[in-house]
């Protein structure tokens, strides 16, 4: 997502109780931050924040963490919380390729990848969030039966991702080429991007993949 | 494929040296029929026969068997052989759901499914050639590292098949949503149906799946 640079975004973030200024401090101890042992679900790249905010409302027994690289993007998402302290929601500004700095081995239960950058050029394949090096990072921080839930409107990224999941021995499930016309539509929480693109007739692809320990 | 009923098709078939009139006789002994121990590749549903005839020409070190239910369809395909005896090619008229009557356990190395009937109605899902009961039959007759190669122009059948392969623990590879634009196009042998449909701009989906013994 492209946003204007927002001067002072990083300072502004610290005003929000759901923003975690010192995320490395919680590695291996996120349960302390949340004050309970509930499962932790992570969204990588939070867009405008509707998805993670909605899930946090719907599932008070799950702890949600949004990990997003750009301060301006985190700020847009965290603004939805209106300075409220939401006990099961946290926003982190960090590089997703370094998830192992944020989370101990097997500390989290699920990862959401929503409309990640497709990086269409072959020479940028390693930057795609389903490239095998990312999958191995996810496997490290996810519990043994942990899951990845991926949505995209980009067919090439979807095709690439299915092949990566298969090659890295992730167990796939609920593969759909048209989420909004599928039986999974009822429980689907749309991101802002998803709503805009699907309203133009763009189909949404989705897959769940669980890490089968090699 | 729909064809007019051809009177006397079954009798006509017996005139062709590549047609095997008594296929059950060879169960477990197809190497006797071919006179060698070369790997056996099977096409289920042979269409007009170009695919299997072309593969047999290109790969003299592989034995090919086309299994097709309808006598009229087998006849059209076998007519391409022009009454020649082709040492590594055999045509069989038989029901693919009964492959275990034709082949001993682990007797064959590869199965091709080309443009199988999509059976679009949900209540007919069990008839699709990638339904789990078929996959378990294939697993039984295929060698341990045996492969299924599937092509289709039907997106719903492809989506269904990917889910079946995943659920039945087949290891997928080379998943492509547009075969003719992919790196696999160079080695692709087009069926008659494929040529006709792709010339109209219809995309071809393809996947390889190998049976990982449970």
Swiss-Prot record, chains A, B:
S-adenosyl-L-methionine binds at residues 43, 68, 95, 117. The keyword Nucleus does not apply. It catalyses: guanosine(46) in tRNA + S-adenosyl-L-methionine = N(7)-methylguanosine(46) in tRNA + S-adenosyl-L-homocysteine. It is an enzyme of class 2 (transferase). The active site is at residue 117. Pathway: tRNA modification; N(7)-methylguanine-tRNA biosynthesis. Keywords: Methyltransferase, S-adenosyl-L-methionine, Transferase, tRNA processing. Its EC number is 2.1.1.33. It holds the Pfam family Methyltransf_4. Coiled coil: none annotated. The keyword Transferase applies. Substrate binds at residues 121, 153, 191-194. PROSITE patterns: SAM_MT_TRMB. One of its GO terms (molecular function) is tRNA (guanine(46)-N7)-methyltransferase activity. It comes from the Bacteria. Catalyzes the formation of N(7)-methylguanine at position 46 (m7G46) in tRNA. Belongs to the class I-like SAM-binding methyltransferase superfamily. TrmB family. This is tRNA (guanine-N(7)-)-methyltransferase.
């Amino acid at each position: 997502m492209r946003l204007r640079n927002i001067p002072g975004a990083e300072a502004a973030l610290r005003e929000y109780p759901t923003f975690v200024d010192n995320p490395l401090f919680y590695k291996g101890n996120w349960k302390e931050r949340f004050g309970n042992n509930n499962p932790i679900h992570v969204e990588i790249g939070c867009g405008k924040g509707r998805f993670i905010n909605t899930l946090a409302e719907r599932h008070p027994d799950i702890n949600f963490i949004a990990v997003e690289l750009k301060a301006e993007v985190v700020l847009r998402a965290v603004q939805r919380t209106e300075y409220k302290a939401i006990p099961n929601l946290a926003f982190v500004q960090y590089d997703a390729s370094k998830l192992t700095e944020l989370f101990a081995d097997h500390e989290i239960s699920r990862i959401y990848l929503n409309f990640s950058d497709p990086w269409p050029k072959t020479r940028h394949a390693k930057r795609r969030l389903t490239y095998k090096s990312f999958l191995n990072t996810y496997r490290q921080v996810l519990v043994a039966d942990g899951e990845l839930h991926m949505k995209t409107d980009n067919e090439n990224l979807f095709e690439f991702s299915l092949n990566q999941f298969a090659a890295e021995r992730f167990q796939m499930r609920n593969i759909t080429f048209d989420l909004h016309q599928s039986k999974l539509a009822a429980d689907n929480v749309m991101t802002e991007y998803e709503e805009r693109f699907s309203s133009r007739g763009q189909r949404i692809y989705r897959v769940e993949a669980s890490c089968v320990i090699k």
